């Protein structure tokens, strides 16, 4: 009986922790503007005609990316200088594979003065899970 109770508690805690790991849609006001964590649906709708930045490696980008995206690798030593070539007053839409690199890149973009930063919740994985197309 104790083993069953421990197993049930372990499963419940595991599910609870996993549910908390994924970023939820949110809005964070920063010194320079705002960082929005948005759903794939909102990202798809609102990024049309805007700057879309894929912060994955060039190899990951070559294997498939959101149409119209430019690749600025977060791990590139020139990441920030490449970002600064973009218009900081225009919205930017940033994504990676799962959302972790995007969070870092979004904070860096905001710190550099980007006023409207949009972070794809769940990254490209969630984009694909929603049956949205990627291109090579």
Segment roles from a protein language model:
Residues 2-8, 18-41, 46-50, 58-90, ...:
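Rhodanese-like catalytic fold shared by cysteine-dependent sulfurtransferases
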């Amino acid at each position: 009986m104790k083993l069953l109770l421990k197993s049930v508690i372990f499963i419940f805690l595991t599910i609870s922790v996993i549910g908390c790991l994924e970023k939820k849609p949110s809005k964070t006001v920063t010194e320079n503007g705002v960082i929005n964590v948005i759903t794939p649906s909102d990202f798809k709708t609102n990024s049309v005609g805007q700057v879309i930045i894929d912060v994955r490696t060039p190899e990951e980008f070559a294997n498939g990316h959101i149409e119209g995206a430019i690749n600025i690798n977060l791990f590139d030593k020139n990441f920030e200088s490449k970002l600064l070539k973009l218009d900081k007053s225009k919205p930017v839409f940033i994504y990676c594979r799962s959302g972790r690199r995007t969070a870092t890149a979004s904070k860096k973009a905001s710190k550099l003065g980007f006023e409207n930063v949009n972070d794809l919740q769940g990254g490209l994985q969630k984009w694909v899970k929603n049956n949205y197309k990627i291109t090579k």
